[in-house]
Each structure stands twice: as C-alpha cells, then as structure tokens.
Amino acid sequence: MPISIPLNATLQYSSPSSSSSSSSLVPSSPLFSPIPSTTVSLTGIRQRCLRMVTSCVSNAQKSVLNGATDSVSVVGREQIRLGLPSKGRMAADSLDLLKDCQLFVKQVNPRQYVAQIPQLPNTEVWFQRPKDIVRKLLSGDLDLGIVGLDIVGEFGQGNEDLIIVHEALNFGDCHLSLAIPNYGIFENIKSLKELAQMPQWTEERPLRVATGFTYLGPKFMKDNGIKHVTFSTADGALEAAPAMGIADAILDLVSSGTTLKENNLKEIEGGVVLESQAALVASRRALTERKGALETVHEILERLEAHLKANGQFTVVANMRGTDAEEVAERVKTQPSLSGLQGPTISPVYCKRDGKVTIEYYAIVICVPKKALYESVQQLRAVGGSGVLVSPVTYIFHEETPRWSQLLSNLGL
C-alpha cells in the first residue's frame, strides 16, 4: 500500500534491516532478454554509476536513524532561515508561489545562495539542494523549507523533529512508483501481488530493483511482505536498467508516465509508494524554541492559504430589482450555484430619481469557482440579474486557517 504523509504529520518509519549478503548485479543467465530493437552501449559506463546499496545513511544523516533526533541547540542565531530549492523547476515554482503571496525574494547576486524577503525582515532565504534542505532542518541549520514530500520521506526517515506545515502547495506533483518491463516474463504481470508471487524470486536470485530511494524503497517492499528483493542505485537514467539486464524493475518518480512508456516499462496496481508535491516543512525544535519562528510560520502559512484558496475563484457582481433584500435573497437562493462562500452578499443600490434617493436595485456579490462561472452567470440572469461583472479573486483570508490550528495542536501548544 502507498505511504501517506498526512497534514502536520510526524514522519515515523522504522528503518529496514540491512542484509550482509551480496549478490552479482548481472546474473550469468538473465531471466528475460531485452526487446530485439533495443541497443545499449556500455562504453564509458563507470563502475560507480551502478553500485549495490550497503548503507543508505551518510554521515550527514546519522541523526535521523529510527526517528532519533540529536540534541541540536537552536539558540545563538536570531534570523529565521527558510530553505528553497536552488535550481530546476521546483526552484522557479517556489519563487513564483512566494511572489504570488507578496513575498518577494531579493538576491543581490544571482550566484549567491543567500537572499532576503523584505516583507519578513527577520528571515533569511538559503538556496539548497532539496535533500540538503531536509538534512539542514534536522541539523538545526534551517528552520523552514519548501521541498517535495518524496524528499521529506526519503531523507527525513521518520525523524520526529520534521513537521509538515502545508502538504499541498500545488506544484511539483508526481508519485514514487514501481515500474517493470512490459515484455518477457513480466508481460502479463499487472499487480504488485502478482509480481511478489512470481516463482523466479528466491533468496539466491531476488528481485532486483534500481532506485535512488534507498530508504522508501526497502521500507515499501518490507511493508508489503516482499522478502526476496535487493536494491541498487544508479546515477540517473534508471529506465535503461531493465533493458540492460542489470535490474528487473525500477522505483522512480513518475509525472506523466511518458518516459516509462518510451522505455517499454509499465506501472502496476499497488506499486505506488508515495504521492508527492511541494510542501512547507519545518523543524519542530525551531518552532518551539527559536524566537519569532512560530510567528513567521503563521504569516507565511496565512499568505499561502489565502492565495491557494483563491486560486480558480471569481467574484461575480450583478444588480437585481427587488422590493427588499430578503425578497432578492429568496430568489438568489433558489439557484444551486449562487451560494458563495457562506452565502450571497446583498446590498442596496442607491439611485437618484426626481431629486430623491431611492432603492430600485440590489447588488448581489458571490464567489464562484471557475468551473461554475458561466453556469452562475446564467442562473443570475434567470432570477433577474443584469450588468454582471466578473473578476478573479487574489486572496481569501478566513478568520483563521485550519492548518494553523492543526499545527498548534501537533506542537502541543
């Protein structure tokens, strides 16, 4: 079953047991042959490009084993540090999101890895690799970070200090999934259960999986009761591993699935490890111990929520004749798409007739999603609305964002 990371969750995984046994990456008798049209050149392939995983924990990760947290003091630094991806699509999308929330990241020099947000004067921005954002949250060098949930799961490894503040920033969507060839002995395999039950996998000849996720991969297999499996890491181009005969399957991030299809690979039922997208993550210790950190998170969260809530929403304004506001409200409420956020706002429109101020129209203001926009306009017309104005909504601020209340509860505050 897929690994889910709920809102404000403390990521708690048990570290999979390692095996001391080793096996050859390339068996003398492969279980299937590459498709005839596949030609793979091994020229220039270095030994380090494919290696057996003997340990998935580097020195920088020792503090996250089994959810343990080294005692790292958060005192001695006044600035709140926000980690952002340093390059790629995630980096651009993170900056765009903050800009949409009126948080402008200012770099004196684009080659510098430190920046400021004038709207948050006590906050520094540090541009880092996604995996280093997670590591530095754990070490206390960062307080907040925007990173994919897949990276949080892989490099956080269940550390209790990591807390997810907002799990759905609406970019970086993908999923971590197991993929197998669509030919040879796998041609008729359609599910993880069928893959696990294949008689070919034994202790001497386990299922070989190439992946860059050396924590989530073994954990997923263990959770699903698949015993005869071994993992290897590759420096990119995982899709070529099965055709080269050096892996039976791959475990990698999938967006559209086009790359898998072009390399004669397929996903299988039950093979999704994790659904991922960009998330706002924080250090529990920083939020509870560093002065100003919780207030900064509150402001960032409110801005994010207001912008994301307004995404795809439109304000519709129309004038309608009526005897009084209640009578107009009764007509409006008969239409299913005119309820708004809490209900329609109805206010009098004051007109001057023969030197006197009179009320002949009432203005109706509602908020509707984009998919229901035209239908709402038609329904307003049906009950007497005219002069319909439509404008996009930029922000929707509630009394308090539910995620803030959940965060405080998760922190025990």
UniProtKB/Swiss-Prot annotation:
Classification via Pfam families: HisG, HisG_C
Keyword Transit peptide carried by entry: yes
Matching PROSITE patterns: ATP_P_PHORIBOSYLTR
Cofactor: Mg(2+)
InterPro entries assigned to the protein according to its UniProt record, in alphabetical order: ATP-PRT_HisG_long, ATP_PRibTrfase_cat, ATP_PRibTrfase_CS, ATP_PRibTrfase_HisG, HisG_C, N-reg_PII-like_a/b, N-reg_PII/ATP_PRibTrfase_C
Tree of life domain: Eukaryota
Catalytic activity annotation: 1-(5-phospho-beta-D-ribosyl)-ATP + diphosphate = 5-phospho-alpha-D-ribose 1-diphosphate + ATP
A GO molecular-function descriptor: ATP phosphoribosyltransferase activity
A GO-annotated cellular component: chloroplast stroma
UniProt keyword list: Amino-acid biosynthesis, Chloroplast, Glycosyltransferase, Histidine biosynthesis, Plastid, Transferase, Transit peptide
Activity control, per UniProt: Feedback inhibited by L-histidine.
Protein purpose: Catalyzes the condensation of ATP and 5-phosphoribose 1-diphosphate to form N'-(5'-phosphoribosyl)-ATP (PR-ATP).
Family, as annotated: Belongs to the ATP phosphoribosyltransferase family. Long subfamily.
NCBIfam families cross-referenced by the UniProt entry: hisG, HisG_C-term
Protein's name in the database: ATP phosphoribosyltransferase 2, chloroplastic
Native source organism of the sequence: Arabidopsis thaliana (Mouse-ear cress)
